[in-house]
Amino acid sequence: MSFVVTVPEAVAAAAGDLAAIGSTLREATAAAAGPTTGLAAAAADDVSIAVSQLFGRYGQEFQTVSNQLAAFHTEFVRTLNRGAAAYLNTESANGGQLFGQIEAGQRAVSAAAAAAPGGAYGQLVANTATNLESLYGAWSANPFPFLRQIIANQQVYWQQIAAALANAVQNFPALVANLPAAIDAAVQQFLAFNAAYYIQQIISSQIGFAQLFATTVGQGVTSVIAGWPNLAAELQLAFQQLLVGDYNAAVANLGKAMTNLLVTGFDTSDVTIGTMGTTISVTAKPKLLGPLGDLFTIMTIPAQEAQYFTNLMPPSILRDMSQNFTNVLTTLSNPNIQAVASFDIATTAGTLSTFFGVPLVLTYATLGAPFASLNAIATSAETIEQALLAGNYLGAVGALIDAPAHALDGFLNSATVLDTPILVPTGLPSPLPPTVGITLHLPFDGILVPPHPVTATISFPGAPVPIPGFPTTVTVFGTPFMGMAPLLINYIPQQLALAIKPAA
């Protein structure tokens, strides 16, 4: 989806207009060269000579500044012309890969900022205002959903209490008549209550949770230790790229190094495959492997504890409230991933929906702003370095001036994409593909980035016969990704409201 439309003809026309303006300015400057640098002394006295020299120096400085402005103007016009040509070439080339587009866009923005120092600050203000407006619009359409659902639930509980009281008043004589029998039944039920059994069950469940915690912590520590050599090697590669000036690649490898340490792979054993004609349907529930997956497993223990004690309660309003509390814990700690894909091999048409639990989306949002800001700093550093190597010192100064704005814009409004490959075995006989490859292009978003879908590249690695049209990049439906602000203000409260909403 394209959010910006650029007309190369308009850019070229603007460059022509600026060139004409530049010619006029140069003519005016040349005409003023004599009068501003060749002032004659009014008299032969010392004061007149000093005044004449003073104005002469100012005239020379005026000519120097005029020459600098002319050089800046020429460079700006040249940049506009190059930009128009670049847009024409880009449109005719029909785009590229998503990360390449983002990286190229960042470089283009930095190059434009080098030609017009300070422009990045205006872009920062515009992007921030747009995202804040989007954030407020989404919130105002559904303000405080979790709080409103809590209030709605209390109203339901009071209605149930009122109905129970009305029933008791209406049937009061019968209740009084049956009171001795009810008391006797309650006493018998209390005497028959097997407290030892439930105590044993509670102790066993707590031991099980403790064992799960200890085992998971051990697995996480083991995974970190095992992945440390690879982390060191990848960090060394990133450092070498930093030394040679490939700053964006260094940042990308830094992100991959940390990702590979925390996520060592996916358990794709939970897969359901279906075929109908030339259409293949795949439902996969991959599980994260590695320290991050172990951390998510530990996070689910409180929700399991709450569900266990909720199940011990008899049907009542108190149990409903306990179940709602359990649902909140489950929503906040559920790390599940579910991918549903459908592909028609004959037409190469298909859909892909991926649903992520709140912990995973929250993890990406937490890391998103620092990583996007770091990537913006790397882009500015490359722009400065390239300008210096080309002898474009004015461009280098402009990029240096705009670097803080780019860094803050990345922290607030930008996104940096890292690829996450998932290989799902199909178990299908030949000549059908044995594996479906799903490479998710997951974004690290700035704090204010509004919800947006992600994309993925679908391929069939190891297929006996190449499948026309693959690999292909598709838009992924399902859980959107976003920055921390819309996640905390809108998305998570909406998910919690759904978690405690009574079933229809």
Curated annotation (Swiss-Prot):
Secreted is among the record's keywords: yes
Pfam family, one: PE
Compartment(s) of residence: Secreted, Cell wall
Disulfide bridge positions per record: none
One Gene Ontology cellular component: extracellular region
Annotated PE domain residues: 4-94
Gene3D superfamilies: HP0062-like domain
GO biological processes: symbiont-mediated suppression of host phagosome maturation
SUPFAM superfamilies: PE/PPE dimer-like
Biotech use: Exhibits vaccine potential. Immunogenicity is demonstrated in BALB/c mice. Interaction with TLR2 induces activation of human dendritic cells (DCs). Immunization with this protein induces a significant number of CD8+ T cells and a strong Th1-type response, with high gamma interferon (IFN-gamma) and low interleukin-4 responses, and activation of the bactericidal activity of macrophages. Identified T-cell epitopes may contribute to immunity against tuberculosis if included in a vaccine.
Subunit organization: Interacts with host Toll-like receptor 2 (TLR2).
Family to which the UniProt record says this protein belongs: Belongs to the mycobacterial PE family. PGRS subfamily.
Protein name: PE-PGRS family protein PE_PGRS62
UniProt source species: Mycobacterium tuberculosis (strain ATCC 25618 / H37Rv)
